[in-house]
């Protein structure tokens, strides 16, 4: 028994020693594991910090604390020329200028532009929140200028699936055809009366008439019509307000970068935007309100235009998907988006061709070859009018409607072209710089439509490689490039087919100079026309 007790005691002692050793081993293992994990985490943090330190902002001026380069911006108007001069001085294709706390990133390189709008499109899918955009969008209820979020996604889906899909484009063909004929009739009346033709006035109002017809079913806001088919006083007021608002949209207003100054209106931008928006509302809202009432009361049941589509869309429960507060600013936004780009391209194209008669001759020869002189050019002819479209591509390239594309805001920190782009940065793709980049375009300042011709394929007005910008691309790109192509091409083709153009007496050349404050031709193009088709082909004003 003593032997058993002794053996038992030895066994207990051995077991305790084994457990003690196991516990020590487990503790040591856990300590080692924790230590290794901490080392790995520390290494990761250090590596990330090192990488962040390696990535710098794009080159640019240092600026003042807090306010950045705002003081210089205020005395450097127009701001777009100042920003391009900075890039030229630094010899860079991407730059960073801090305005307040906002990093403004400017880009003139197609490769970098593709990195932003193609490779990292989703990351740069937002818009800035500014005073002007808040006014125009009724508190960010629209599609084009509303920051990224649920409201943007809702409105973008409506526009893309209900308004500008291929089926809707075909459905509204007749309305566009009516405005093409109205353009020809209006210009015919001016030419027949020996009146000079202001191309800026005509091209803008053609585009305005077309979008009003598509949106509201009418080309005019007046009860009366002008005798020669031109716009009424109401239509002129609306167009002027629209271009006023366009000129102050994303226009480097001081309060956009120093929000504490909002309401002081130090440079007058806020009042201009309020007044312009109110004028457009004055013409749009009564039509919208009356149409909503007609649908609500059952007096209208057939969809005839974009406004009807907006009103008639239902949600999953059968209720109206959109409120009046969403419909009104979205219509205003879409109406504003239509006239400036096509009209500017056609005015510049005509000005360039007057100074280069050989290009004008080739364009008219193509129209005569494709269409002939026994009928008017139609949208169905557009695929074959490659030289005409090459002229328009060259106008978009060399003479963009604006110096910069609408801003793309970074939703998080990003890396572009090897540079650190902080969250909230505004990336501005330079329409001006992309189209005139000498690394991309040979002899970039010369107007040469032939550079866009490709014998193997049809010429299109879109530019997917972002070597220039006609209609912007990506999640925030142009929603209706097909409509833009139709309006721009038909506008130029009808003006060329129906009339022979020359400068007024005692003028031999057009001075191809940009305005001091924007990218439009400094002086509106005015010419004198002669009929070049059989008289019976010209439509009458209806």
From Swiss-Prot:
UniProt xrefs under CDD domains: CYP79
Annotated membrane topology: Single-pass membrane protein
Cofactor: heme
Alphabetical keyword list: Heme, Iron, Membrane, Metal-binding, Monooxygenase, Oxidoreductase, Transmembrane, Transmembrane helix
Record SUPFAM superfamilies: Cytochrome P450
E.C. number(s) listed in UniProt: 1.14.-.-
Gene Ontology molecular-function annotations: heme binding; iron ion binding; monooxygenase activity; oxidoreductase activity, acting on paired donors, with incorporation or reduction of molecular oxygen
EC supergroup of this enzyme: oxidoreductase
Residues spanning the signal sequence: none
Cited function: Converts tyrosine to para-hydrophenylacetaldoxime in para-hydroxybenzylglucosinolate biosynthesis.
Family statement drawn from the similarity comment of this UniProt entry: Belongs to the cytochrome P450 family.
Protein name: Cytochrome P450 79B1
Species lineage: Eukaryota, Viridiplantae, Streptophyta, Embryophyta, Tracheophyta
